C-alpha cells in the first residue's frame, strides 16, 4: 500500500509518502501559485506513486477551523481521487516538525510543511498498530 499525506496551506502544500505502512519520507512541498496548478501537481504525484490512500490534515481548534476545513475539502475534491481519503487532525504537527530541527523556519521553501505531512503519515500508521 502506498499512501500520500498532505499538509494543505494557502501558500504551500507539504507532502509525504509512505510505502507498505513502514517507510515514510517527506517529499518536496508544492508551492501554490493557484489551486488548479497545485491540484495538477498533486494529481501527478498520486499517479506517479500509485497512491491508494490519501491522508489529509485538517486543523482542529482555532478561529478559522471551519473556513480552512471547507477550503481543504474543496481542494481535495479538485484532485478527483477515487480511492480512500482519510482526514486527520493536523494539530501540533508543525510544532513537532520544528522540534526535528531540520527545517529552516526563515525560508518559505515548504520543508517544514512536508515534515508536518511526514509526522501526520507516521502518526496515522502508528495509531493503527
From Swiss-Prot:
Cystine residue pairs: none
Function: Could be a nuclease involved in processing of the 5'-end of pre-16S rRNA.
Family of this protein: Belongs to the YqgF nuclease family.
Enzyme Commission number(s): 3.1.-.-
InterPro entries: RNaseH-like_sf, YqgF, YqgF/RNaseH-like_dom, YqgF/RNaseH-like_dom_sf
Signal peptide: none
GO molecular-function terms, A-Z: nuclease activity
Coiled-coil region list: none
GO biological process: rRNA 5'-end processing
Pfam family, one: RuvX
Name this polypeptide is given: Putative pre-16S rRNA nuclease
Keywords recorded for this protein, A-Z: Cytoplasm, Hydrolase, Nuclease, Ribosome biogenesis
Source organism: Campylobacter jejuni subsp. doylei (strain ATCC BAA-1458 / RM4099 / 269.97)
GO cellular component: a single term: cytosol
Record carries keyword Hydrolase: yes
Primary location group: cytoplasm
Subcellular location(s) per record: Cytoplasm
Amino acid at each position: 500500500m502506498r499512501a500520500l499525506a498532505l499538509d494543505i496551506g494557502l501558500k504551500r502544500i507539504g507532502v509525504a509518502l509512505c510505502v507498505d505502512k513502514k517507510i515514510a519520507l517527506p517529499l518536496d512541498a508544492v508551492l501554490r501559485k493557484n489551486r488548479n496548478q497545485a491540484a495538477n501537481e498533486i494529481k501527478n504525484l498520486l499517479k506517479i506513486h500509485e497512491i491508494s490512500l490519501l491522508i489529509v490534515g485538517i486543523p482542529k481548534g482555532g478561529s478559522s477551523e471551519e473556513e480552512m476545513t471547507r477550503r481543504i475539502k474543496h481542494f481535495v475534491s479538485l484532485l478527483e481521487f477515487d480511492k480512500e481519503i482519510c482526514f486527520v487532525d493536523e494539530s501540533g504537527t508543525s510544532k513537532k516538525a520544528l522540534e526535528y530541527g531540520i527545517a529552516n523556519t526563515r525560508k518559505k521553501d515548504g520543508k517544514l510543511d512536508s515534515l508536518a505531512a511526514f509526522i501526520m503519515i507516521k502518526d496515522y500508521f502508528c495509531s493503527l498498530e
